[in-house]
Amino acid sequence: MKFRVEREVLAEALGAAARVASTRNNAMPALSGVRIEVTGDKLLLSCTDNDLSVQFVLNVGGQEDGVVVASAKLMSDIVRSMSEGKVTVETTGETVSISSGRAQFTVPTFAATDFPNIVQASAPPVTLAASVFADALRQVVRAASSDMQRLALTGVLMAAEPEGLRLVATDSYRLAVRDLPGSNILGHGEKVVIPSRALNELQRLLASGEEASLCLAGDRATFTVGQATLSTSLLQIEFPNYRQL
């Protein structure tokens, strides 16, 4: 595998991907890695912790197709430390090298077969203006709890209302509700609970796009903004009756 790309482009995507990679799963070291796949002039970066995943598609100067998995944090830190300009990434045996100008770094790799398949929701997507959705998330997500002992409060409720989609979050002390009229993402009476961590990462992605597509199906939610796709498991738990708070 070998490709060339602008440092800034690669650093931004790797930085976002590395935030999703697992830092605690010693049983599956590959979950701390970023999967780098080159096909022609397209680069696919993927990170996942099995619950939350993110993928980026970048245009690069592809020189040799291939797949490699290496530490997401290490790759991100190295590329970010390099000077502006083109960066070359290539595999040699069981290592991947990153070079730019006189600087060159070598990183060990994981077995690509140990990296799990990324599952996305499969249903017709609904498109929203990224700025509108980002504003709604900014108002609501901050009210969710960060206490994992109160799992139901760590998510954001998305519920179908007659006028569109309603977003709700609460930590039992604060309550935030935002309606998105005309956003018919869910069927009548349907509701899902999305982890606030996933929506915090989504907010970062929304800043760089004009539109966002949402797909809710089964036990997953998938969001696409530009060349980035974020997918998360839904919280299989009953959200509190916020109308009584």
Annotate each predicted stretch with a short phrase.
Residues M1-L245:
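Structural preference for solvent-exposed beta-strand-turn elements
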